[in-house]
């Protein structure tokens, strides 16, 4: 087993501002520019596949596949994974063709395809669950966030969708571009890069944040906050991040795309059975957080976090790796996004047919084949390709 990490020169920490995705300056990613990118891919079919990721445990499958040599085993040339600091910088690089495969917030994937008309496809779920609402030590209930600001990683994120469901369930109103009011029972939403959230909580700038791990585990380890609710306890086994590939990769390098998916699915199967070992790999040059914090995030138990769970049988505390992309989730997510407040272009949601979105945006061909190669759906604790969504704020 290899323990290679990306070289220092490949770590791109771009963009220090908010994680809001506005779509400005993204013309290079529109479908009419696809021919230029296609020509580039066709001219250099052996160019290494370039991977982009954020320093969060959500990226585990992409990174485990690299560390364990699974891409090599699948005969797929890959460059060292490139670390980005914010979702906006990662998304912009992907749309502009600077990286070929990434993990991405699923609502952002919808915006990328329908808002920006980018030539991209969801090819698998990258993971399920893995996020939480973390608050200051003095915050006991969601209602206590009245008059506070809460950080979100991006407007188009499952985090924002689920947070707003929690706020409304507690009788609070999310607001943007205005100061929150305790008497008015409002909460200000503040887009922020995940790496900035813990310092902001510690300095009293925000009352809480909703984000992927290991930033929730880090807050508890440093005793500056506590996990109030795991998002997987609100929306059971939801897809936070999906695996996305550029259309150029799928069209002009189908063997590389298929091999890449084989490696990714193999990594998911390995990671869900080897959590401490996964933490060790991630801490060896891929993520900046220390191994104990990463391992804590990968090994949460319902017994230790009972106060953050209302449905312990859902195991919403558990970051899991289940690659099959369920149509029911896509459809419910589209409907939820249409009810979510954002300070970003939202016209692309008007008139979207949830079922059609899944057929147009998600291509499960490769992942279905790859799942069979590692033992089928049962290898991931799954029993079928349909399910019913369960949401309880």
Describe each model-derived feature in a short phrase.
Residues 4, 10-32:
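N-terminal export signals
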Residues 8-9, 164:
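Short, cationic motifs built from Arg/Lys/His that form the positively charged side of catalytic pockets
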Residues 106-108, 183, 195-293:
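Pocket-lining segment of extracytoplasmic ligand-binding domains
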Residues 110, 164, 168, 217, ...:
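Predominant activation on well-ordered alpha-helical scaffold segments within soluble catalytic domains
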Residues 253-347:
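Secondary-structure end/capping motifs
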Residues 331-393:
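Conserved C-terminal helix/tail region of periplasmic/extracytoplasmic solute-binding proteins
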